[in-house]
Amino acid sequence: MGDSDDEYDRKRRDKFRGERSAGGGGDSYGRGADRPDRSRGRDDWPDRVRPRQDYRDYRPPPRDRGYSPAREGPTVKRMRGDTWGDEGRHRFGAHDGYGMYGYAHDHFGMHPTVGPYGHQHATHQREPVVSGDMQTQPCMMTLKQFLATQDDSISDSDAITKYNEYKLEFRRQQMNEFFVAHKDEEWFKIKYHPEESQKRKEEQLSFLKRRCEVFLELLKSKEIGKVSVDASNTDALLRLLDTVVIKLEGGTEEDLKVLDIKPSVVEAAARTPATLNEEKVKTESKVDATAKELAVKMEEDSSKQETETDVLSVPQSEEDARNGNSKIKEELSKSMDDGNENGDKSKSNDAQKSEKEIAEVEHEAHKHESEDRKKRSRSDSGSSSSSSSSSSSSESEEEKDERMNKEDNEDEENMRIPEEEKKSDSADTMDNINRDKEVDEGKPVCDAEDLNTADDRDDNADQNKEQNEFEETTKDKNSSDPVNDENKENSDKKSQQEGDSKAETIDLAKDPADGGSRALHRTSSIFLRNLAPSITKAEVEAMCRRYNGFLRVAIADPLLERRWFRRGWVTFKREVNIKEICWNLNNIRLRDCELGAIVNKDLSRRVRPVNGITCHKTVVRSDIKLGAKIAHNLDDKWGLWKETPTAASGTGEAGDKNGSEVQPEESFGLQSKNPVLQNITDYLIEEASAEEEELLGLSEDSKKVSEGELIERDPQLIEVLDRLILYLRIVHSVDFYNHCEYPYEDEMPNRCGIIHARGPPSQSKVMSNEIQEYIRTFEGKMASFLTRMVDIDETDMKKLGAKDAEAEVEKFITANTQELAKDKWLCPLSGKKFKGPDFVRKHIFNKHAEKVEEVRKEVEYFNNYLKDSKRPQLPEHPGNAKKPGSEGATSATANASVGAGGYRNQPFGMSHSYAPMYASYAAASMMAPNPRGRAGFGRGGRMGGPDYRPVIHYRDLDAPREPDEFL
């Protein structure tokens, strides 16, 4: 009786298992200790990667479960190497070498089923190598494939005509499918929808006009002329850009004073909680010394208080001295009930204050002076109260005096302290949990001075809380107490001093309500890495508006490589706790999409240098010409200077002569009303003494070509160029020296964040051909700004399948007119029945006019998409670009390309544009023939030099062998 399937698999797996053990050799079957371990786990190998195969496939006669021999590759013996482990697998985790080229058996023997490191391949062996997420159009039929579908009697001209029609119809179908797939997405509507696109254009035009107003304001104030676009002038450039941002945010001249403050001060005012924790750790080493100093000061204050008490009042007994100490304890500690631990609590309170960063000696002096005055007043009140009541004990006298003084302070603060200080004090009475809650909500973190004033407010808040507890019992006593007037004066002085100390702490990153300077150019932002195409900007704004300090949202255009996912930037005010907000956003899924929120760092280098050759006079003159063309082209695109704007009413007579006429000629100084382009042609004309050189026989050009020339700066030309560069950067968001445009910059966290400037010039001579090559290269990079957007004409649009609005309306009416029976028609939109189709038509126009209007808008929507010459669409299939009959040429280039960049040769006859039939880390090919001139595995040379072909000769076997005949 034959073995079962399980027994067969067990024997086959255990055949070489002992030889692959970690011991390295010996008779594995002689070791009885290892056998039980192997037999126990041989039936269940969880880390086994190789798929199980039916052992019947190895038998010569075909069985019922075997595959066709034509659809399966030959069985190849696997090769063992030094890298094989005890489990019979390659150490990299790739598949065993059972297949043709290191792959497992599949329905097709040469199918790549497993990729490097055991990953699955996403492409067929005959499909071109593309990324897994890349989407392409379907493969179009070749001419040969198309002719196979046609009649054999078709002529050549008809075949070519029909094939061209097929290609055109294929393009129509692909564009229509792309439109239907993306027409409901926000980014697509912003580009082509008749209503959404118009709103977007108006919004962008308002941004441009606002930027233009700010630029003209700075131009009139001569702020633009003071700045040169050089990398050595970084501070002035950054100040100008920050000034523009503050003015765009609606800032005033008071807000511009923030730019005059050193960055270190601004950074100290905008510290994060992590920074405060670091500073707190640094100051812990100084806590003990500060506590000792404060203890000495408080002892001196207590001694002064005792002497002043002796002078102002009758000498008191030991109870009065203890009464005075209790007043000191009242001001320094939060607890009032423990009278036996006055010294310990005063020291602990001092240490607590020093831990909260007591930074300024002046602030401490003011605080101690107020405490001295308060103690003197309380000692007087304590002495008078103790002398008036003789029947009660000393402890009861102390409690009564404390309650009376508290109530006096409360009444005085309610009368004298302004309304704003009341609100701040009431807010400070919250406990630690509420304070943590405020931090979670994103409120700003105070600096060292704010911590000092907050500490004082905490003490006052504790006093107010205790005063409220005894309010009912002491109200009558305080109203009849003659000491109230003196206490009111002292508390009034104390409140004024506290108000002065609060006014000294100003956080520059905050937005104060009293109209102080605001750092509007500094923001905090969060970067959203993944936004599904279905997520709208309004949804992101609604999600982020719940957090304090929210400003705006910017969403980029989708990318094909990222499956049309978009990226977003959420901008907040500078003082918010941006990390807490980012953590909350990471816990939110919007439309079942993880946002991938991370904190966006500040810009590292805002002014970046470029080649120093840009300072040369020849290059500057070329850049002026190029920049003037770009500025004129962008102004004409948005229509900024077509009509006389109010901001540029006094720019000169040249702008008034033209009125609102628009002429297509590119005449900069005469036809443009832009003040930057006025009289710019005077600087574009080059002057040279050509006649003098000709008469004298001089040849300056030949000297320049042979010897080169030093970089020469022309300050007048550079001033004109800088004005152009700053106009493009501020108004149109075009970084001239970086030859790029920063899109949707008005919604980004950093407006006018980066600019490229001229670097330091070289001290060596520059050849003329180098200058011309630089100018030519720079013009090529800026060519995209010089070409005007031209829409497709009507004839081409009809070829691409442009729709007619009236025809589509008729189709809509026909589709919604259904005949039920004779003289019985139905309108499916409303469910009403009519006697004829004309009545249904009239009903649709009257009752469903909005549906008809939607059809017209849909037609305009689609036509706007077709009209765009740079419309987004899926890339063509790589197989469409392949020319038929070029397989021989591509195979040669394939071998060259793989030999240069690959690890081993491609399979024979494979093109370089297709995926190889073996994985990068799989077993090497054992059956593919090698190209000529390369050694194989079993041939001489060991993959060394060329292996020469044997000489072919012919010999008659019946003839005798000649002595010089070679074999």
From Swiss-Prot:
UniProt xrefs under InterPro entries: Nucleotide-bd_a/b_plait_sf (IPR012677), RBD_domain_sf (IPR035979), SE/Ars2 (IPR039727), SERRATE/Ars2_C (IPR007042), SERRATE/Ars2_N (IPR021933)
A cellular component annotation (GO) from this entry: nuclear body
Record-annotated disulphide pairs: none
Subcellular location: Nucleus
Keywords: Nucleus, RNA-mediated gene silencing
UniProt name for this protein: Serrate RNA effector molecule homolog
Family designation: Belongs to the ARS2 family.
Record keyword Nucleus present: yes
Species annotation: Anopheles gambiae
Listed CDD domains: RRM_SF
Residue segments, region Disordered: 1-84, 296-518, 645-669, 868-893
One Pfam assignment: ARS2
The keyword Nucleus appears for this protein: yes
Biased composition (Acidic residues): 447-459
BP terms from Gene Ontology: primary miRNA processing
Compositionally biased tracts (Basic and acidic residues): 8-20, 32-66, 296-307, 319-374, 414-426, 433-446, 460-513
Role according to the record: Acts as a mediator between the cap-binding complex (CBC) and RNA-mediated gene silencing (RNAi). Involved in innate immunity via the short interfering RNAs (siRNAs) processing machinery by restricting the viral RNA production. Also involved microRNA (miRNA)-mediated silencing by contributing to the stability and delivery of primary miRNA transcripts to the primary miRNA processing complex.
Molecular function GO labels: nucleic acid binding
Compositional bias per record (Low complexity), positions renumbered to this chain: 380-394
